[in-house]
A protein has these predicted regions:
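N-terminal signal peptide c-region/cleavage motif recognized by signal peptidases
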Residues: 17-19
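Regulatory, non-catalytic segments
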Residues: 23-150
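Bacterial N-terminal signal peptides that target proteins for export
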Residues: 1-8
Length: 150
């Protein structure tokens, strides 16, 4: 009888000990945004020298998560310019994927700029979100646009 009780005690002790030391696997961290860039292909109307461009990537709540402001210089017809955005904080991929891109033009005089553009977002797990937008334009009368990343 003593042997049976000792055996049961050992089994119970083993069960409680293994449960106490067992650890659940840590949940996988959601990837975070590590870099962002926007590539602009000017089409039929150039961007003037003094005209500045602001680029913002926003999360699903509309908060800025990457930006580049005051991009100036003449962007001629049929030219390509790449703008690197500064990432703010540690935005997660899920929030970014449902976000948007906002562009604002600050012309010093009359200006119409026609372009296509592509936004590339790189994450900590080496995945990318790339979205392209075609037949875009901004003018002194219509200086802003917002495009969805969905």
């Amino acid at each position: 009888m003593k042997t049976i009780i000792c055996s049961i005690a050992l089994v119970v002790l083993a069960l409680f000990t293994s449960a106490a030391f067992a650890q659940e696997a840590a949940p996988a961290q959601e990837p975070i945004l590590t870099s962002a860039e926007a590539k602009f292909d000017t089409t039929t109307d150039n961007k003037d020298q003094q005209t500045k461009l602001d680029v913002y990537v926003k999360n699903s709540d509309g908060h800025e998560i990457a930006k580049s402001e005051g991009n100036e210089g003449r962007w001629n017809k049929n030219s390509t310019h790449t703008v690197t955005l500064q990432v703010e904080g540690s935005p997660m991929k899920g929030d970014v994927a449902n976000g948007s891109v906002s562009l604002t033009l600050h012309p010093q005089r009359r200006n119409k700029w026609s372009f296509n553009y592509t936004v590339t977002l790189k994450f900590s797990d080496d995945t990318f979100i790339t979205r392209g937008f075609n037949a875009c334009y901004l003018t002194d009368h219509d200086p802003a646009r917002t495009d969805s990343l969905k």
